[in-house]
A protein has these predicted regions:
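Conserved functional hotspot residues or short segments at active or partner-binding sites
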Residues: 38
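EAL-family c-di-GMP phosphodiesterase catalytic domain
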Residues: 18-32, 45-154
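A short, hydrophobic coiled-coil helix within the histidine kinase transmitter core
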Residues: 4-8
Length: 154
């Protein structure tokens, strides 16, 4: 798998410095024995990996020690429930502290309200993803810079 992926990326001339592959928490567990060697091989070659949907309740914290990831993406349900569930901010802070101990960046998903940005930053979140910043769009549209989705969400 690792050799196939390297050839695919090389064939398209993509810059690895601008690419970070996501491993979903669920898929990492389902195919761990297959995924781990491939991820380790690619990470040794400088590839970036993010553990996606972390905190969804599927993986143990041990996967942060086993998988050579550089980024942890906090499951969006924790962000969605940030203001209504008092435990969500506590879990986010704990995940941020754990990631910091490993030297990992933390991304919060599903950020749909810009008012959450200061609170998430105070808990240790490095980056956010969601409609608060930008609506999804096709790569070709983003590259052209003239997509109707280019405007931040209201």
């Amino acid at each position: 798998f690792a050799d196939w992926l390297k050839a695919l990326i090389a064939g398209h001339g993509l810059d690895l410095g601008r690419l970070c592959l996501e491993i979903t928490e669920r898929h990492a567990l389902e195919r761990f024995e297959f995924a781990l060697p491939a991820v380790r091989t690619l990470a040794a070659d400088g590839w970036c990996f993010a553990l996606d949907d972390f905190g969804a309740g599927v993986a143990s914290f041990g996967y942060l020690a086993d998988l050579p990831v550089q980024v942890v993406k906090i499951d969006g349900r924790l962000v969605r429930d940030f203001e209504s569930d008092p435990i969500s901010p506590v879990i986010i802070e704990a995940l941020c502290r754990l990631a910091r101990l490993r030297g990992l960046r933390v991304v919060a998903e599903w950020v749909e309200d810009a008012s959450l940005l200061p609170a998430l930053a105070a808990l240790g979140v490095d980056d956010v993803q969601g409609f608060a910043l930008h609506r999804p769009e096709l790569l070709a549209e983003a590259a052209a810079g003239d997509s109707p989705a280019s405007a931040p969400a209201a």
